Each structure stands twice: as structure tokens, then as C-alpha cells.
Amino acid sequence: MEAPPDPRPHASAAAPLRAPEVARLREEQEKVVTNCQEKIQHWKKVDNDYNALQERLSTLPDKLSYNIMVPFGPFAFMPGKLVHTNEVTVLLGDNWFAKCSAKQAVGLVEHRKEHVRKTIDDLKKVMKNFESRVEFTEDLQKMSDAAGDIVDIREEIKTDFEFKAKHRIAHKPHSKPKTSDIFEAEFANDLKSKDLLADKELWDRLEELERQEELLGEIDIDSKPDTVIANGEDVSSEEEKEDQNINVNMMHQVTDSLALSSCYNSLTNSELFNGQVNSPLNYSVNGSSSYHSNEDDGDNNDDGGDSENDHDTLGVEDNSIPTIYFSHTVEPKRVRINTGKNTTLKFSEKKEEAKRKRKNSSGSGHSPQELPMIRTPADIYRVFVDVVNGEYVPRKSILKSRSRENSVCSDTSESSAADFDDRRGVLRSISCEEATCSDASESILEEEQENHQKKLLPLSVTPEAFSGTVIEKEFLSPSLTPHPAMAHPVLPTIPERKEVLSEVSEGTTKRVSKFKAARLQQKN
């Protein structure tokens, strides 16, 4: 009678082939465990020997000498005496010896005992690990020997199948994956041709949209404002105008495509393509600002915020592309200028002039320059300044000039230096006796009125320094009467008013301001 066929031929065939391998694995693991046990026994014996030696060394220095039996060969002993009980020779290794005391030898023994204990612990860990492996191998052998308890699953790989995938390579943005890398597998025979056509149309559509997106992105990046204002000056070049013309031509090419024609149907009838925004806008790119004004504010109010968003990306005009540029306003930096002893000003005249230029250039361009606002005593110092190397420098005091040559109101003619040294001492002594607080305040007001008249001039007219003849306070003596060509102001920035003084002495005379003296000189 024949035996029934085995339903699991692979398992029965694999069991006899696997049994000797499992048995060999078990034997090797048992050898490791046995070797570890032998080493542990050896190191335990060494540890016991070190313990006995440590006890002997601890009691050895108690006596000066000991009677002992000295080994003489492997089987013979002879009586002897142990002397120098506190002197021990220690083997350091490689036949190197060192002499030390018994107490030092005890410390060396303790150090070596720690090394022995560490070695024993490591061997115990290895033995425990392999004991668990031996148990697992025994269980595996039992399962392999028993029929039906274990099933070996094998999967055969056909050699005719080839994996054609490639390594992933970083691709350019806005580019689709290659079809050759995706559709490597063979399609079934029942795949319809309609699906292939749909995929092809989809990829064509995606390519077209990507081209349009790239073109629009390049136009938005390359577009620049018509007028750029940087640091209070208008900056424009022919290259920017040429770039704008090129961008316009590119936009016309985009509008010819099918996708943009469908997108622009809802926007062609609107007023977004007039190149204007609903309200005057001040925008900038990379720190440069530009103005776009809209004269017809009421025509585009119905569009709202949607018109601005569409205007930013899709606005097209025959001659220019309206673009919105945003910027963050920054407060002008106010410079702290130390003018001298007790005066410290917080202003920058150059920043204020640049700010006024930007305001005037953004407007009609013909607005008169605004008058200085004087609300505090510190504002007066902004009007009374000197010109040093083309820059405004505040004075230490409005009653005197820091530099006669660079003063705004000083006279720099050659004849002024001739009589200046002779008349300085006399005029200063007179001014010290006759100057009062009211004179200084009235002179400031008169100076401010003259500055207001200069501010009313157009922007193109540059203010000129005072170059007239001034008659200062002098003695009544006819020898000191100034000649018109030699009468120059000692204090050129001090406007003074005419005052009648009581004739206390012969050295006093009438006091006339330099501006009134100039008018009197012209009348004469």
C-alpha cells in the first residue's frame, strides 16, 4: 500500500536539509558556554590566591624574621629564615621587578583583584547570552524535526523581470516628470486608447499653463516703475524704458494664447487697463518709491479690492504695464549735533530739505516752499545756521557767527579784513555796555522776517548771502566815521534795531541795524 502524497512537499524537503545546520549551530554555542565556564573557574582561583596573599602581606611586618621551609626543586624543601619582612619585590610584567613595602603591596593586590572581578563579570554576561541562544536553537530544532509544526515559505523571483527604475534627479521648477520614467511597466492588452489620449491632452494642457505662468512671473519680476525716487532725487534711465517696452510686447504675446483669452473675458470690459489705480499710491521697490495718481477716482470705485489684485497681475495697456509696488515708510533719522557749551540740537537740515524736495516733486512742482515753523527757542537755531563745505552747521549762538567766511549773512569782501582788527576792541566794548535783552529779541524777530521773505521765493532761486554795507555802532569822533567801503559788520548775523541812547559820554552814538544801514546807504 502506497503512502498518501504529502500536501507540503517543500516543508518535508527542507527539514532534513536544515537539521544538520541547526545541530552544528547548537554545538558551537555549547562550546562557547563551556569555554566561558572554564575561564570563570580560572579567574575565581586567581581571585582566591590574591585574597590569601593580601592576608599574608597584612601580617608579615609583625615580626622581624620568620622560620620557613624554602622549596628546593619540585620535591625538596630545606629549612630557612625569612628576613626583611617589610620589603616586598613586585613583578610589574615582562620580567620587570620593583621593591615596595608590605602596605604598598597590599594596595597593588587590591587593584589587581578589581581587574579579576571585572573579567569574571564579563564572562558571566557572555555565558548567559549564549545559554539563551542554546535554548532557542533547541526549540528551533524540535520544531524542524516535528512534521507539520513549521512551514517554510519561499518566494522565487523570475530572472526575466527587470526593474528599470532610475535614481531620482532634482528637476527644474515648473517642469513635469518625464513620461519615460513613469510609464515603464507594460500595459494590459485591454487598455483603451481613450485613456492614453486623455493623458496626452492633460499633459499638453499642463505644459501650456506652465509656460504661461513662467511668462507672467518673469514679466512681474522684470517690471519696474516709470519714475524712481531715491534719497530725494529722481532716477530714471533709458534701459528701464526699453525693458518696459519689451515687457509690453511679451504681454501681447501672452494674450494671444487660448488660456489667457478665456481668463481675460471677464476683465476686458473693465477699466483696469487704463494704467491707473483708484487713489494716488506711493510704492517702491528695494527702497525706491514711485507715484501713480488717478484723476478719475469716482470711475473705479465699484471695482474695489478686486481691481487692485487683478491690476497687479493682469493689467495691460498699449504703452505701459501698471504695476503696484509696496514699501514701508521709515521715519527720517534725526541727527544729534553738539553745537558747543550748553546747546545740543536734534535735527538734520539735509534730511528736511530732501523731504521737502520729495513732497514738491510728487505734487504739482510749483508749490511755494513752506515757511519754517518756530514754536520753541530750539527752532530758532534751525534758521540761524552757517554754511561749512556746502552743509548747514548750527551756530553756538545766534548772537555771533562761527565763521565769517561761511556765514549765511556774512560779507566776505576783501576790504572787510583791513579794518576788522582795529575796530574789534572798540566795538565790543560799546556792545557790552549798550546791549540789552530787548535788543536781542527784536533783532531775532527782524531776522526771521527777512528769512520769511527768502522762503517765499521759488525753489529754483538759491538764497544769496547779504552783501550790502552795514553801519555799526561807532564813536562820535569824525576820525572814526566809517567809510562806505570799509564799514563791515563785526557781528554779521546780529540784526539790530535803531535805538536812541542818552548821551552820557562823548563815546556814545546812535545804534543802527545793518539792514537799515544798507537801505539808508542806497537812498543816499
From Swiss-Prot:
Pfam families found in the cross-reference section: Prefoldin
Protein's name according to its UniProt entry: Unconventional prefoldin RPB5 interactor
UniProt subunit comment: Homodimer. Component of the PAQosome complex which is responsible for the biogenesis of several protein complexes and which consists of R2TP complex members RUVBL1, RUVBL2, RPAP3 and PIH1D1, URI complex members PFDN2, PFDN6, PDRG1, UXT and URI1 as well as ASDURF, POLR2E and DNAAF10/WDR92. Interacts with POLR2E/RPB5, RUVBL2 and RUVBL1. Interacts with PFDN2, PFDN4 and STAP1; the interactions are phosphorylation-dependent and occur in a growth-dependent manner in the mitochondrion. Interacts with UXT.
Chief localisation class: nucleus
Gene: URI1
Role, per record: Involved in gene transcription regulation. Acts as a transcriptional repressor in concert with the corepressor UXT to regulate androgen receptor (AR) transcription. May act as a tumor suppressor to repress AR-mediated gene transcription and to inhibit anchorage-independent growth in prostate cancer cells. Required for cell survival in ovarian cancer cells. Together with UXT, associates with chromatin to the NKX3-1 promoter region.
GO molecular function: chromatin binding; phosphatase inhibitor activity; protein phosphatase inhibitor activity; RNA polymerase II complex binding; transcription corepressor activity
The record's account of how the chain is modified after translation: Phosphorylated. Phosphorylation occurs essentially on serine residues. Phosphorylation occurs in response to androgen treatment in prostate cancer cells in a mTOR-dependent manner. Phosphorylated; hyperhosphorylated in mitochondria in a mTORC-dependent signaling pathway. Phosphorylated at Ser-361 by RPS6KB1 in a growth factor- and rapamycin-dependent manner.
Classification via PANTHER family: RNA POLYMERASE II SUBUNIT 5-MEDIATING PROTEIN NNX3 (PTHR15111), UNCONVENTIONAL PREFOLDIN RPB5 INTERACTOR 1 (PTHR15111:SF0)
Organism: Bos taurus
A GO BP annotation: response to virus
Compositionally biased intervals (Acidic residues): 296-307
